[in-house]
Amino acid sequence: FGNFKIFGSSPEAQIVVKNNIAEIHPIAGTFIRTGNDSEDKKKAIELSKDLKENAEHMMLVDLARNDLSRNGYNLKVKKDREVQFYSHVIHLVSKVVGQIKKSTSTLQIVADTFPAGTLSGAPKHKAMELINKYENSERSFYGGSIGFMDFDGNFNHAIIIRSFLSKNNFLHFQAGALVVSKSKPESELQEVYNKLKALNKAMENAEKYYE
C-alpha cells in the first residue's frame, strides 16, 4: 500500500458474505494460555463458566444480531460461545448468521455492521462517542478491516487486530480490552498485554533471525 505495509494474523472476521448469507463471528472472553496443555484445558473450562467473560460475550452476540437485523432476516446463532485455543490466549467465539434481503447490497450490510462490536462496544454509537472522547490517540488502521470483495458480492474481511503497520521503518501495533461494569482495571490491562504476546514473540523471532 504505497509507503506502508499491514501484516498480521487476525483471529476474527469483521463480516463474511457468501451466497447472500452474512456471518459475524464475535470473539470476546479471553484467558491467557499457560504453555501446559492440561492447565490450558482447566483454563478453558474456567473461561466457559466465568460470568463476567460470558456476559461480555453475549452483549456482543446481541449486538451482532441487531446489526444484521437491519437488512437481514432469519437470524440464527449457529455457534454459541465455543472455546477456541490460539497461540497465547483462549477465546470464546460465536457465529451469528443471517439471510440478506434481496434489495440489499453487500456494501450496505458491511456499513450496517462496521465497526465490529468487539472493537466498539455497545450501544455502538454511544460507545464510539466515548472512545472519541477518552482515547488519547487515534486508532488509525487498528480496528479497521482488510480483505476482499468479488464481483458476485461475496465479501470476506478480517478485523485488523493482532497485526502490524510498518511505515517509515517503524512498526506500530495495538490491542484493547472490552470494559464492562464488572471489569477490574488491572485485569483488563493484563488482557491487553496477553493479546500482544504473539506480536511481541514475532518481533523477538525476527530479531534473532537477523542477528
Give the predicted meaning of each segment.
Residues F1-E211:
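Extended alpha-helical targeting/anchoring segments
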